[in-house]
């Protein structure tokens, strides 16, 4: 055995000799000098001591890591292969005895806590049941032996009679002993069995379980499941005290239908509706199919349809409006400042040709009516006039029946309505409609009886006719001023303005000029050189050039402003009508105009309104199609006149759309496949070509590209400047599409007096013509007692053996009916003809 000295060992491990000797003494070795020898066994003893002093682990490693790698080949298209390497890694950790003991103690404490809680609950339950049983049964005492076998609660009653307070815990303890399974006496041995440490605990507990089984259990108060079992613990089991917890992460199936609160906006898709109801979209689609409405998962439903589906499926519906963005916009537009009086906005309304524009002409000292096509107003005109009594803003509305929507907008944007009634015509349909619009808008009326210089003017008749519709003059005790005027000579115009301004004073009209501008669109059009142009009536605040404005679903910066005379201006205050340039599209007449601080907010609101309008429109259109799908089934297909309509202003386009869509019947209809504001372009001509439509231009013309396509393809393109003409032409076209009806005209009636036989013609009826004229080779009917028994053709007509082409009334003749020989005396032969008659709408 090779030995080294202490000094050599110190040099080898690079440590001082004195320190090495000290460590050897601590290890229990006898070395004291540097020249003493050290054997291998002494080295091992020293090494073991040093490891234990540094708390190193002398046992086997506690953590084992296993790595596994598999390689496979995956073939793809093109005869290529890809190598796939899968690596798996598993780590096994051996716990120390201290950790195992700590976990065992923790589990034991948890189990004891659960047992104590369950024991306490069982005692309370047994006590409660014993008290209930005591109240139900009579208080008479019975023999103790019988009580123990027959009823488990009787001993409690007997003891309670002797000492009611002291004996109370006894029945609870008995009930607990009867109800609970027996717990093992040695939890440590049971714990070893649970960890699989050996079979000693199993063998020790076996006699104990046998003794438990041998004992006859006392009758239970009521069968029940203990809290220990429901929490996953079992008493007296096969050595394993703890089971897996049941329903720890399981899904509890609902015992009844789940009613959810479904929030539905103006539109919602089938998928979103299914998510809110926590059902599959297929169930909603299936349900809608049962209702007769085919749908898809991305189908947009309108609010009414979605509400019907959700309520039918048993859910609670809350209708919401997606107006958070609009509400924030309205909040940002609030402005407080000093208010001043503003000029009244006056709308002139009345029947067509009653002199509305002529009256305004006299007030403005202008000649607008002469420039109107056909002498009728077809746009809303906005003007402000400086009078001796103050400024007044006038809105001139059309009186034709097609412009109902325009008149309704004029009434909404106004403060006072001047109702013009012609003294010679009286109250007409559009007069009544104007009264209804004014009442709906809550606007006061001033009646101007025009054309009083004409003969036949009857003011009392007009007062009487208007009083029927709720407009009573001040002379008759009402509150509506009646002023007699003549727009031609100017009679009564000053009195009319005075009445208007008096009404304005009563209304106390106020505005805040320092606020951001706010108003309403009166009219809009597309100018080829300047782009979209909107006529705006400023209602509050001040609109300035360069402001960022939001108009309906359009927005833009005001590049220029023009007054009603076309002169550029920098700003416009309350009650001033202006034309603004710079919007990204032509807004609808009646849209509200607001000045915003930044472009981002304007764009956000405009895009939101566009998307909302599109969704609502699609949902309603789809709902309408589905509602009519079964009604139209089996009916003959309607003939359709397709029209591409272009107009100079948005209001006229809307009026024409309404008028044209109202034409037609069950067989023919008008469909406006395209339309817009501005001239007829090449795209409009291509649309008309693709949809087989007629091009109509109302106060607009076609550009060179559109004219070229029209000439090459032979399209029908027409220009109009009066709304009467376009409606009449469309009516004629629809009438031509209706075709013609076949009508029967009775030419004559002959009565059979006698019947003769002819070898050539068979039975010949000798007749007297009693009505009209009988013609040869015309269709006839044979009537017997006024009932048609045969329809055929008149083959032979003779008079005194001579052939005749016709026989008039009061004359006798012989008639041979083709292919019919059953003619009898007293029959009537009716001769008629078929005539084609053109149909009309």
UniProtKB/Swiss-Prot annotation:
Region annotation (G1) ranges: 350-357
Keywords recorded for this protein, A-Z: Cytoplasm, GTP-binding, Initiation factor, Nucleotide-binding, Protein biosynthesis
UniProt region (Disordered), positions on chain: 94-258
Gene3D superfamilies assigned to the protein according to its UniProt record, in alphabetical order: P-loop containing nucleotide triphosphate hydrolases, Putative DNA-binding domain, N-terminal subdomain of bacterial translation initiation factor IF2, Translation factors, Translation initiation factor IF- 2, domain 3
Composition bias type Basic residues, residue spans: 235-248
Domain of life: Bacteria
Protein name, entry field: Translation initiation factor IF-2
Lineage of the species this protein comes from: Bacteria, Pseudomonadati, Pseudomonadota, Gammaproteobacteria, Pseudomonadales
């Amino acid at each position: 055995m090779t030995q080294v000295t202490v000094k050599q060992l110190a040099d080898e491990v690079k440590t001082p000799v004195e320190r090495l000797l000290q460590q050897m003494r601590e290890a229990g070795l006898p070395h004291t000098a540097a020249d003493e020898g050290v054997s291998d066994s002494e080295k091992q003893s020293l090494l073991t001591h040093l490891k234990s002093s540094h708390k190193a682990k002398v046992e086997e490693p506690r953590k084992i890591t296993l790595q596994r790698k598999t390689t496979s080949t995956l073939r793809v298209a093109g005869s290529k292969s890809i190598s796939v390497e899968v690596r798996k890694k598993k780590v096994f950790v051996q716990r120390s005895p201290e950790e195992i003991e700590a976990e065992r103690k923790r589990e034991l404490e948890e189990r004891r806590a659960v047992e104590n809680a369950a024991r306490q609950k069982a005692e309370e339950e047994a006590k409660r049941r014993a008290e209930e049983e005591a109240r139900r049964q009579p208080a008479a005492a019975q023999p103790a032996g019988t009580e123990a076998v027959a009823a488990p609660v009787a001993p409690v009653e007997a003891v309670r009679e002797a000492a009611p307070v002291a004996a109370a815990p006894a029945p609870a303890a008995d009930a607990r002993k009867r109800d609970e399974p027996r717990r093992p006496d040695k939890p440590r041995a049971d714990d070893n069995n649970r960890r699989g440490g050996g079979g000693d605990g199993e063998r020790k507990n076996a006699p104990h379980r046998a003794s438990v089984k041998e004992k006859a259990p006392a009758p239970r108060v009521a069968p029940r499941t203990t809290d220990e079992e429901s929490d996953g613990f079992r008493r007296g089991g096969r050595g394993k005290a703890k089971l897996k917890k049941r329903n720890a992460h399981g899904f509890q199936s609902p015992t009844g239908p789940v009613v959810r609160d479904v929030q539905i906006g103006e539109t919602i898709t089938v998928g979103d509706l299914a998510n809110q109801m926590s059902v599959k979209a297929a169930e909603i689609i299936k349900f809608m199919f049962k209702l007769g409405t085919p749908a898809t998962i991305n189908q947009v439903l309108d609010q009414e349809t979605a509400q019907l589906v959700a309520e039918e499926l048993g859910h609670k519906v809350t209708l919401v409006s997606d107006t958070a963005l609009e509400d924030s916009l309205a909040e940002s537009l609030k402005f407080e400042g000093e208010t001043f009086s503003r000029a009244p906005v006056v709308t002139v309304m009345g029947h067509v040709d009653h002199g509305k524009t002529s009256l305004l002409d006299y007030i403005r000292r202008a000649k607008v009516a002469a420039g109107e096509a056909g002498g009728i107003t077809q746009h809303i005109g906005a003007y402000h006039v400086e009078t001796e009594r103050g400024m007044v803003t006038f809105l001139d509305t059309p009186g034709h029946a097609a412009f109902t929507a325009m008149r309704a907008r004029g009434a909404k944007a106004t403060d006072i309505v001047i109702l013009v009634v012609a003294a010679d015509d009286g109250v007409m349909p559009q007069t009544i409609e104007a009264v209804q619009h004014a009442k709906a808008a809550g606007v006061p009326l001033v009646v101007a009886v025009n054309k009083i210089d004409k003969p036949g003017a009857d003011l009392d008749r007009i007062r009487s006719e208007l009083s029927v519709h709720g407009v009573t003059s001040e002379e008759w005790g009402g509150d509506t001023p009646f002023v007699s005027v003549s727009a031609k000579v100017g009679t009564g115009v000053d009195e009319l303005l005075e009445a208007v301004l008096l009404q304005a004073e009563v209304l106390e009209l106020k505005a805040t000029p320092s606020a951001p501008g706010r108003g309403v669109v009166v009219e809009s059009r597309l100018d080829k050189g300047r782009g979209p142009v909107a006529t705006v009536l400023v209602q509050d605040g001040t609109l300035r050039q360069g402001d960022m404005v939001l108009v309906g679903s359009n927005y833009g910066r005001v590049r220029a402003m023009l007054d009603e005379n076309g002169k550029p201006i920098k700003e416009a205050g309350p009650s001033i009508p202006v034309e603004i340039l710079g919007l990204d599209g032509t807004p609808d007449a009646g849209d509200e105009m607001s000045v915003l601080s930044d472009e981002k907010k304007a764009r956000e609101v405009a895009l939101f309104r566009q998307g909302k309008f599109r969704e609502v429109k699609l949902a309603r259109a789809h709902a309408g199609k589905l509602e009519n799908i079964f009604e139209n089934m089996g009916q003959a297909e309607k003939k359709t006149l397709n029209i591409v309509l272009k107009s100079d202003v948005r209001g006229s386009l809307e009026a024409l759309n309404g008028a044209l869509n109202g034409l037609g019947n069950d067989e023919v209809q008008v469909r406006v496949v395209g339309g817009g504001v501005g001239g007829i372009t090449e795209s409009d001509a291509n649309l008309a070509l693709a949809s087989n439509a007629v091009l109509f231009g109302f106060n607009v013309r076609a550009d060179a590209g559109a004219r070229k396509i029209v000439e090459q393809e032979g399209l029908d393109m027409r220009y109009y400047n009066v709304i009467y003409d376009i409606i009449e032409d469309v009516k004629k076209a629809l009438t031509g599409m209706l075709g013609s009806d076949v009508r029967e005209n009775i030419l004559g009636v002959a009565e059979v007096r006698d019947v003769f036989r002819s070898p050539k013609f068979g039975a010949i009826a000798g007749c007297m013509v009693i009505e009209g004229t009988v013609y040869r080779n015309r269709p006839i009917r044979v009537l017997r007692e006024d009932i048609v028994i045969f329809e055929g053709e008149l083959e032979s007509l003779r008079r005194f053996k001579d052939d005749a082409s016709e026989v008039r009334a009061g004359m006798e003749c012989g008639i041979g009916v083709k292919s019919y020989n059953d003619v009898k005396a007293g029959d009537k032969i009716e001769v008629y003809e078929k005539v084609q008659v053109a149909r009309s709408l």
